[in-house]
Amino acid sequence: MLQNIRIVLVETSHTGNMGSVARAMKTMGLTNLWLVNPLVKPDSQAIALAAGASDVIGNAQIVDTLDEALAGCSLVVGTSARSRTLPWPMLDPRECGLKSVAEAANTPVALVFGRERVGLTNDELQKCHYHVAIAANPEYSSLNLAMAVQVIAYEVRMAWLATQENGDAADHEETPYPLVDDLERFYGHLEQTLLSTGFIRENHPGQVMNKLRRLFTRARPESQELNILRGILASIEQQNKGK
């Protein structure tokens, strides 16, 4: 189950942080590390700061885009330290741990951490089902990357231990949710349909599509429900072709 939980680091700029994150992960039983377009490659400093978790560094998946790191996942949670202009469903670390473990029983889950200085972009955060914020001291809320990973990884482990005590099947998520790849195809299909009907303009699709993403993220349709929505879009396209 824990192997299904990916820790995804976006454009990390310090190899020492990679090593410290690997150590934070392994102490909590997590080993599935993904590096998205790292600005530096893991080196001897990363190995040194991993302190016995060099296998996590050595087995890390290095990819060019966030989409590659999220492929195959049914749940994506992004860390966010500041309020955004576009509200999004929020979790605290404990809720994040519970949801991640429940869903990881069946499909991969991605926990996404942003750049050391600026975090995740709004576009990256919109690829997430939920955002998670750590309730640090508001007068000094400066958590480094490894600290943030440690907090979330601890809550994941606590949730996982609870399932071991209560029986593996007790908290498993049974609802079949679509994978991130399926959702992105749906959003592409939706945008094309709205363009073809004239509901949105080709040079200004962003605001409407952003709000629709938020709507469907909040509703979180099941796989069967998403198929119905795709069928509706296909029917609209057929009607337009017949005109």
Curated annotation (Swiss-Prot):
Q: Which GO terms describe its molecular function?
A: RNA binding; tRNA (cytidine(32)/uridine(32)-2'-O)-methyltransferase activity
One GO biological process term: tRNA nucleoside ribose methylation
Q: Output a single Gene Ontology CC term carried by this record.
A: cytosol
Chief subcellular location equals cytoplasm
Q: Where are the transmembrane segments?
A: none
* Keywords of the record: Cytoplasm, Methyltransferase, S-adenosyl-L-methionine, Transferase, tRNA processing
* Residues that, per the record, bind S-adenosyl-L-methionine: T79, S80, A81, G114, I134, S141, S142, L143
Q: InterPro entries given for it?
A: Alpha/beta_knot_MTases, RNA_MeTrfase_TrmJ/LasT, SpoU_MeTrfase, tRNA_m1G_MTases_N
Keyword Electron transport among UniProt keywords? no
Location within or outside the cell:
Cytoplasm
Q: What is its EC number?
A: 2.1.1.200
Presence of keyword tRNA processing = yes
Subunit structure, per the record?
A: Homodimer.
Family per UniProt? Answer: Belongs to the class IV-like SAM-binding methyltransferase superfamily. RNA methyltransferase TrmH family.
Role according to the record: Catalyzes the formation of 2'O-methylated cytidine (Cm32) or 2'O-methylated uridine (Um32) at position 32 in tRNA.
User: What PANTHER family does its record include?
Assistant: TRNA (CYTIDINE_URIDINE-2'-O-)-METHYLTRANSFERASE TRMJ (PTHR42786:SF2), TRNA/RRNA METHYLTRANSFERASE (PTHR42786)
- What protein name applies here? tRNA (cytidine/uridine-2'-O-)-methyltransferase TrmJ
Species of origin reads: Salmonella typhimurium (strain LT2 / SGSC1412 / ATCC 700720)
